[in-house]
């Protein structure tokens, strides 16, 4: 059934709005998946905070025009599902990677981030990207390590002095 022009405009506006706040995007070929498998993918996407939509390629091209995901325009060929990571840059890639393990028919086509287009070989790299909280925790640990070592060194001076005095006292 053909979509009316108003419906097409609404879809383009919705996808464009989602893309404006997305951190990364992934597209995959979903041919060969059953309805239950697609429903499962949608459920997993909702749980992981990923916007997932099957959208016509022409409408997707209109939606990505003027966004950082414009690099995807030439890669939109065939029936594709579009996933946008909202909270963590690797969320969509992680979702697709985990789903692809159990479903051979599901094939990741491209990934995009910060205006750059990446092939499916980068899926593992994207999936390993830390969440914001994980990145901040790692940064905090890196910043805290020298201070912790310095405090331990300062604490060791009186401890060594006490041990020396105890050894001298034991020897007399």
Swiss-Prot record:
Gene3D superfamilies (alphabetical): 3.30.70.1730, 6.10.250.290
Pfam families linked to this entry: Ribosomal_L10 (PF00466)
Alphabetical keyword list: Ribonucleoprotein, Ribosomal protein, RNA-binding, rRNA-binding
Highest rank taxon of the organism: Bacteria
Function: Forms part of the ribosomal stalk, playing a central role in the interaction of the ribosome with GTP-bound translation factors.
NCBIfam families: PRK00099.1-1
Protein's UniProt name: Large ribosomal subunit protein uL10
Native species: Francisella tularensis subsp. mediasiatica (strain FSC147)
Name of the gene encoding the protein in the UniProt record: rplJ
């Amino acid at each position: 059934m053909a979509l009316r022009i108003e419906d097409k405009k609404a879809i383009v506006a919705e996808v464009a709005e989602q893309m404006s706040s997305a951190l990364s995007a992934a597209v995959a070929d979903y041919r060969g998946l059953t309805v239950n498998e697609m429903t499962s993918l949608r459920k997993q996407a909702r749980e992981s905070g990923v916007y997932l939509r099957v959208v016509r390629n022409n409408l997707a091209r209109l939606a990505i025009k003027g966004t950082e995901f414009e690099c995807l325009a030439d890669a939109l060929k065939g029936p594709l599902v579009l996933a946008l990571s909202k909270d963590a840059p690797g969320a969509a890639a992680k979702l697709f990677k985990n789903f692809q393990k159990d479903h051979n028919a599901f094939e990741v086509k491209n990934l995009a981030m910060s205006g750059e287009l990446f092939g499916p070989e980068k899926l593992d790299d994207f999936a390993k990207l830390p969440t914001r909280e994980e990145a901040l925790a790692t940064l905090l640990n890196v910043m805290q390590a020298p201070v912790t070592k310095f405090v331990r060194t300062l604490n060791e001076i009186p401890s060594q002095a006490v041990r020396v005095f105890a050894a001298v006292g034991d020897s007399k």
